[in-house]
Amino acid sequence: MAQLWGGRFTKETDKLVYNFNASISFDKRFYEQDIQGSKAHVMMLAKQGILTDDEKQQILDGLESIRRDVENGKLEITEEYEDIHSFVEANLIDRIGDAGKKLHTGRSRNDQVALDMKLYTRSEITALQGLVVDMLRELLAIMKDNTETIMPGFTHLQKAQPITLAHHMGAYFEMFKRDHMRLKDIYKRMNTCPLGSGALAGTTYDLDRAYTAELLGFDGPTLNSMDSVSDRDYLIELMSALSTIMMHLSRFSEEVIIWNSNEYQFVDIDDSYSTVSSIMPQKKNPDSAELVRGKTGRVYGALTSILTTMKGIPLAYNKDMQEDKELVFDAIDTVKGCLALFTGMLATMKFNKERMLESCRHGFTNATDAADYLVNHGVPFRDAHGIVGKLVLYCIDKKIALDDMSLEEYKEISPVFEEDIYDAISMETCVNKRNTIGAPGPEAMKKVIALHEAYLEEC
């Protein structure tokens, strides 16, 4: 057990307790952030005259050699160390001697781990933003190619009105755009530097916290040392944002699974994103989409766990907070994997446009437009609604669509109908005349697509 502290104790830490407390098995992924933060801390200490320039250079060179050796596989992060902080410091002392013992001057593991977590989270938010943008670009590409691809829109999972594939994909664009904006907001709100807060009450050393913050790319130092070492709000916000991303992916997955079914046949998931049954050779299963849907609960669990962990913790730092890391790591890894997979699946998926259009015709999706036709000919809407309800009932009995009715059949139900009813209820007319902003009409969609392109240009 490699331990750098414990002079106050007269007994060795019980191995069971040591292993129970140790976090090296998971916080070793912080090694780059821990070294990055230590370099900035050392540069600040030298600037303030707390370290000599020679000591500064020795420590910086030693830290860089550790980083390089870990990256190249020459140095393994083993579980003989309690955490990543002790691993870095112990190896530094082994390499450069007494100068390495000065690394921790004016610093506590409390503000050190708070910094590491922020540096790591900041980097991962940037990566997540990139993956969300990839999704947005793929959605936009589908939208641009399908402004006139007619399909049924659904409410209550029943065919409702004709829309376009571009319009449907546009709904998901809006969702993931909000996700992207949420990630940007979290980054901005969390971008303050906790280093220099010490254990909870700052330090007696003359530290230049603003300089350290500047070196590390933060907007400035945190303003309360107790909050600095016990703040997990930004992680809760991130877990909430990741849960929302997964909720959107899960909804999308559910639709893809339904659309891919034999009953719908709206899409064909590429073989490279499908699996086959071990017993039924005819099966092509949408396992990728199903797993994305299934992993959503895992990310929800991370959010709930962190909230539950934090709810009863008094100020300032408590060991409970160590429990945040595995949850955050797993949630981030899960969401990154799901975003990348889903974007790839979407890029290779084929859309059955003819099937979508045919589904519209046989679902009475133009019934609302038939009612609007009557309203435009002077019939009160409530009466028009009842008349079209009778039309639908008639068609169901005859096993035909509204388009298949003769004019005589129309007139038997209402004399208001004329020959132009057929144009009024054609799927193309139903979609094309809906051109207010946000509607599925091609002209409306082109304006929205232009706005989306402008947004992505700024990403």
What residue spans do the PLM features occupy?
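Acidic, glycine-rich loop-and-beta core segments that form the ion-binding/anion-interacting portion
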Residues: 216-308
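Short, well-ordered beta-strand elements within core beta-sheets of diverse protein domains
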Residues: 43-51, 120, 164-167, 236-244, ...
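Conserved hydrophobic residue
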Residues: 51, 75, 264-265, 380, ...
